[in-house]
């Protein structure tokens, strides 16, 4: 049986990593990379050969080839208080509000600006204070529509919606997503989206026309642990894993029970290039 290092080198020139066909092999490599200090995000050793794992493998091989003794090129995840202070600084620069009262949730999407669609390669960060203690949760999500809509079906004749980065104050509330289950729904205020209508399957950030209004850009879930976005998102912000979404919604319910029925939630979408801490 190959060691994790041998698996990495065996797949050095195989972009698709075809030999790594079991989650146990992938998990073994992930554990090895984490032990060397590589940042796989909060996904950790989940057995899923995602983009962060592939990037970490590439970085490890590059470091070895350059004689760098496998020094990781990805930064480690900062401690909660450091992360919170960095977000506060970003919000101040952008004139965004940062919520500091008990159980007021700062819900923050971090968009990876890779134009390749159909991956859960973005992140949703929740920061809040509870009983004077700071808390942070981080979840894998997509902030972009999937190829099922980008290439095939346009719900709006103007094009598929891609939520524009910005802060949407009090635009969300707890409600039913498509009448099926509790989610955060965009019913309290307008949002601005780009319209991508060329059906080329790539995400056209900042190149299309913009559209502002009520489009049902909800925050909801995909499947139990989805790999591809496909038709899970037509512009919504969508959790990769159901268990993460359930935890998030329970937190929103707890917030509402403290702040009062009909609590309004603010959603802030940032672009990763402007968030050096992640």
Locations of the language-model features?
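A detector of low-complexity, intrinsically disordered, Ser/Thr/Gly/Pro/Ala-rich segments
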Residues: 1-3, 51, 190
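Long terminal regulatory regions of eukaryotic proteins
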Residues: 2-12, 16-20, 75-78, 82, ...
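Short amphipathic alpha-helical segments, especially helix-boundary/capping motifs
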Residues: 3-8, 31-34, 220-226
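Short acidic, glycine/serine/threonine-rich helix-capping segments at coil-helix boundaries
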Residues: 9-74
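Cell wall/extracellular polymer interaction/catalysis modules
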Residues: 69-230, 244-265, 271-274, 278
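Local cysteine-cluster metal-coordination motifs and their immediate loop/turn environment
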Residues: 233
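Cell-envelope and extracellular/periplasmic
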Residues: 240-241
């Amino acid at each position: 049986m190959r060691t994790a290092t041998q698996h990495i080198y065996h797949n050095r020139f195989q972009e698709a990593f075809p030999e790594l066909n079991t989650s146990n092999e992938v998990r073994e490599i992930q554990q090895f990379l984490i032990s060397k200090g590589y940042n796989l995000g909060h996904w950790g050793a989940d057995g899923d050969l995602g983009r962060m794992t592939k990037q970490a493998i590439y970085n490890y091989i590059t470091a070895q080839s350059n004689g760098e003794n496998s020094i990781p090129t990805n930064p480690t995840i900062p401690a909660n208080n450091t992360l919170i202070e960095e977000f506060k600084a970003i919000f101040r620069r952008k004139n965004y509000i940062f919520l500091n009262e008990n159980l007021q949730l700062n819900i923050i999407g971090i968009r990876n600006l890779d134009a390749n669609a159909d991956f859960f390669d973005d992140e949703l960060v929740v920061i809040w204070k509870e009983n004077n203690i700071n808390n942070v949760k981080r979840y894998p999500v997509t902030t972009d529509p999937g190829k099922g809509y980008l290439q095939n079906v346009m719900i709006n004749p103007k094009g598929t919606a891609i939520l524009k980065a910005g802060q949407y104050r009090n635009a969300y509330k707890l409600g039913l997503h498509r009448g099926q289950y509790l989610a955060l729904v965009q019913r309290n205020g307008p949002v601005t989206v780009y319209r991508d209508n060329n059906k080329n399957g790539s995400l056209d950030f900042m190149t299309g026309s913009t559209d502002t209004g009520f489009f049902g850009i909800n925050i909801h879930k995909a499947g139990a642990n989805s790999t591809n976005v496909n038709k899970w998102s037509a512009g919504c912000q969508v959790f990769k894993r159901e268990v993460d979404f359930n935890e998030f919604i329970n937190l929103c319910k707890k917030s509402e029970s403290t702040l009062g029925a009909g609590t309004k939630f603010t959603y802030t979408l940032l672009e990763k290039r402007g968030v050096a801490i992640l």
